[in-house]
């Protein structure tokens, strides 16, 4: 067994000198929420401490390259809300200053007019404000002007390079109807009427669809003087892609004449079963559209080269498989036509994400999860790839948001995080990967916390493979004492336990409560190549669960481990329900958040059918066959869609999958279990959690149910989040301490 160890705290970071935040002195909005001044007792991290941390996001480098604009959200547990305001910092990390102290959140802030002004969204509309005193200690936004009047609100926007045009996201009615659609007098009636899939998605009923509109960038932006990019389409598509797509799915060409965008031009059942999303080139002048002919699965994140001669994007080859390898593609563009499509990462083992062109249009920086760490890479036109960040750097880096020249040295401006701290800005030297943090938003809080230790272990699986497992130890860990342990079961199922930071599944917080926390990167994780990732599809009840038991047995072998829990969300919740019926006496308690309990009924009630169809055993040969209508007589093809992962399929993989559902093994349940679910969870509906709890009660198993009526697959409201943490740790402490 191989081990590598890192300690938390200031010594684990490459920090520049800490500086004092300068703030404006003008009158503050009464609804403003500012940085927390929480005082921590005995260095112990608590849920209250976690929720007090500022959340930094969306950095933007000024046109002159001297100043970084970014936002920070602060949370008030008492008011049960967060508020996001704007900050600036010099590009070298000196002199951080607060730019706004508003009571309403500000988002999507962008430099305009050569840095003399900023455009942003507040209250669902686009605003413009002049910057004043940016180089001093008291910067301000003045002369605030509302530019838009869009009744359905604006979600995001992107301004053309010459700042004469703007594209923005708003909403149109969908095919899902409500009572007032047929009778305006029924404005107090609540119902949804659907005649096809998908009528709900993630956390909302699909009564509206996002569309992207183009308008002149000036005061008076309204629907009547805007052009819908999808206006020529006969069907109701979405742009950007729901539920988590944004402006990263659209990009202006450097000359402002074209917009590249990603869109799944399918509706109903075809939409629900397919991931076939294409890249389209929209001509702003005449509204014509050209598709990049890829077929297959997701094609996303289009990005023009600075010289306008090429387009880069991310592409998955197989329709219906959302965890396919994400390839970095490029194509030439001239005279409105696409040519020379090529895969720059054909020989790269990992998934590409977040492409960023170099200024000379010859190379692309991107990030990728590789062996449990998210790093930054560069690929040249010939497909040669160089890792920029250091291979042994225990951080997760986002893609660079800017490339700067500091004398002879090229630097990347990006953000990073780890299990020790949330997102901060960082500069990375391209030559050697040396990283220097340039913001310290939460240092006044983190510096009060007791240090802990993180370890990387390679655990042997039942078939002799090495599995990366992160292990976090409590502060003041003493191997001669006894500690309870937690095995974290990953969601997804395709994902990775890396150095990411979470405000719910926070492993530093768990270790601070006195637990040894193990994070196994079992079969199905995405940072170890496609073979390791793809093994899990059609084998939910197989090797990946044995991987958890291997990690648990590894932990159990340590003399300092006492009782042991298994906890997880989503697929991790499914894993917990499965382990409850097969673990013997390995675990002393379980926690399942938003887990799948009954695979058969999960297929009937979930929304993204492509995922269930593929992973439940359908795979490629049973996934999606366009062009047919009605039952084909083979027991699998209905409505033109092969449903080989369905409960009625005779496909051997699917038959095995449903036979091994957690609900079929409940007579072996005997270990205390906490079931948590949100009623607005449409990915894994909440009756799955209730069914698991009801069953545990009927089996005589000590159990508890926590239901959040107004939360989805995640827990987002501050007071609900705090309550979630309290229930989580109360249950662990009751059965493991």
Residue ranges and their predicted role:
Residues 28-33, 83-84, 171-235, 262-265, ...:
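Predominantly five- to eight-bladed beta-propeller fold
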Residues 53-68, 103-119, 149-166, 199-212, ...:
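Conserved beta-propeller blade repeats
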Residues 58-60, 167-169, 192-193, 198-211, ...:
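Non-catalytic accessory segments flanking enzyme active sites
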Residues 78-84, 121, 204-208, 270-277, ...:
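Short, solvent-exposed loop/turn segments at conserved positions within beta-propeller repeat blades
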Residues 90-94, 130-135, 217-221, 283-287, ...:
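Short loop/turn segments that connect beta-strands within beta-propeller blades
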Residues 125-211:
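Asp-box/WD-like beta-propeller blade repeats and closely related beta-sheet repeat scaffolds
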Residues 441-563, 569-570, 604:
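Cap/lid segment of the alpha/beta-hydrolase catalytic domain
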Residues 519-737:
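Active-site-proximal cap/loop segments of hydrolase catalytic domains
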């Amino acid at each position: 067994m191989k081990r590598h160890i890192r300690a938390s705290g200031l010594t684990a970071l490459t920090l520049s000198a800490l500086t004092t935040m300068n703030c404006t002195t003008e009158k503050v909005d009464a609804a403003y929420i500012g940085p927390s001044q929480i005082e921590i007792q005995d260095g112990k991290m608590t849920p209250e401490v976690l929720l007090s941390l500022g959340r930094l996001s969306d950095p933007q480098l000024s046109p002159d390259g001297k100043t970084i604009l970014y936002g920070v959200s602060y949370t008030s547990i008492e008011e049960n809300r967060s508020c996001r305001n704007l900050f600036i910092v010099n590009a070298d990390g000196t002199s951080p200053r607060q730019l706004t102290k508003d009571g309403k959140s500000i988002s999507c802030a962008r430099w305009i007019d050569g840095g003399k002004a900023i455009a942003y969204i507040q209250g669902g509309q686009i605003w413009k404000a002049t910057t004043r005193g940016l180089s001093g200690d008291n910067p301000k936004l003045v002369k605030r002007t509302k530019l838009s009047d869009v009744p359905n609100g604006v979600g995001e926007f992107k301004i053309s390079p010459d700042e004469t045009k703007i594209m923005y996201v708003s909403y149109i009615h969908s095919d899902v109807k409500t009572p007032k659609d047929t009778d305006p007098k029924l404005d107090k009636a609540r119902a949804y009427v659907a005649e096809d899939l998908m009528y709900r998605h993630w956390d909302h009923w699909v009564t509206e669809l996002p569309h992207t509109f183009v308008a002149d960038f000036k005061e008076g932006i309204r629907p009547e003087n805007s052009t819908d990019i999808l206006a020529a389409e006969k069907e109701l598509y979405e742009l950007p892609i729901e539920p988590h797509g944004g402006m990263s799915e659209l990009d202006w060409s450097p000359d402002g004449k074209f917009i590249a965008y990603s869109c799944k031009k399918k509706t109903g059942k075809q939409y629900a079963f397919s991931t076939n999303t294409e890249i389209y080139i929209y001509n702003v002048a005449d509204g014509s559209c050209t598709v990049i002919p890829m077929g297959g699965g997701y094609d996303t994140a289009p990005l023009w080269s600075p010289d306008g001669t090429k387009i880069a994007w991310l592409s998955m080859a197989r329709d219906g498989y959302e965890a396919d390898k994400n390839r970095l593609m490029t194509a030439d563009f001239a005279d409105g036509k696409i040519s020379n499509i090529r895969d720059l990462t054909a020989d790269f083992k990992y998934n590409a994400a977040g492409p960023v062109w170099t200024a000379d249009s010859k190379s692309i920086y991107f990030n990728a999860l590789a062996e449990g760490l998210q790093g930054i890479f560069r690929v040249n036109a010939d497909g040669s790839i160089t890792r920029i960040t250091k291979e042994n750097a225990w951080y997760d880096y986002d893609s660079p948001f800017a490339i700067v020249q500091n004398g002879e040295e090229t630097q990347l401006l990006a953000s990073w995080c780890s299990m020790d701290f949330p997102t901060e800005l960082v500069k990375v030297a391209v030559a050697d990967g040396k990283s220097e943090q340039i913001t310290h938003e939460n240092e006044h809080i983190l510096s009060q916390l007791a240090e802990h230790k993180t370890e990387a272990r390679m655990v042997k699986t039942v078939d002799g493979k090495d599995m990366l497992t992160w292990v976090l130890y409590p502060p003041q860990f003493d191997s001669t004492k006894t500690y309870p342990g937690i095995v974290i079961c990953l969601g997804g199922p395709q994902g990775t336990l890396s150095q990411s930071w979470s405000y719910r599944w926070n492993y530093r917080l768990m270790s601070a409560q006195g637990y040894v926390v193990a994070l196994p990167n079992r079969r199905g994780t995405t940072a170890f190549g496609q073979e390791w990732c793809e093994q899990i599809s059609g084998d939910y009840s197989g090797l990946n669960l044995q991987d958890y038991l291997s990690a648990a047995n590894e932990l159990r072998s340590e003399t300092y481990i006492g009782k042991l829990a298994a906890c997880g969300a989503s697929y991790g919740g499914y894993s917990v329900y499965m382990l409850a019926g097969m673990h013997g006496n390995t675990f002393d308690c379980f926690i399942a958040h938003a887990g799948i309990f009954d695979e058969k009924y999960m297929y009937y009630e979930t929304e993204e059918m492509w995922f269930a169809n593929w992973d439940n055993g359908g795979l490629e040969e049973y996934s999606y066959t366009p062009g047919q209508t009605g039952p084909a007589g083979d027991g699998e093809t209905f409505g033109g869609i092969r449903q080989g992962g369905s409960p009625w399929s005779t496909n051997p993989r699917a038959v095995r999958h449903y036979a091994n559902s957690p609900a079929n093994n409940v007579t072996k349940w005997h270990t205390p279990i906490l079931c948590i679910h949100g009623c607005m969870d449409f990915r894994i509906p909440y009756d799955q959690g209730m069914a698991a709890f009801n069953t545990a009660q009927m089996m005589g198993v000590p159990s508890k149910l926590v239901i959040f009526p107004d939360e989805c697959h995640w827990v987002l409201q501050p007071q609900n989040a705090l309550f979630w943490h309290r229930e989580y740790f109360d249950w662990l402490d009751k059965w493991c301490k």
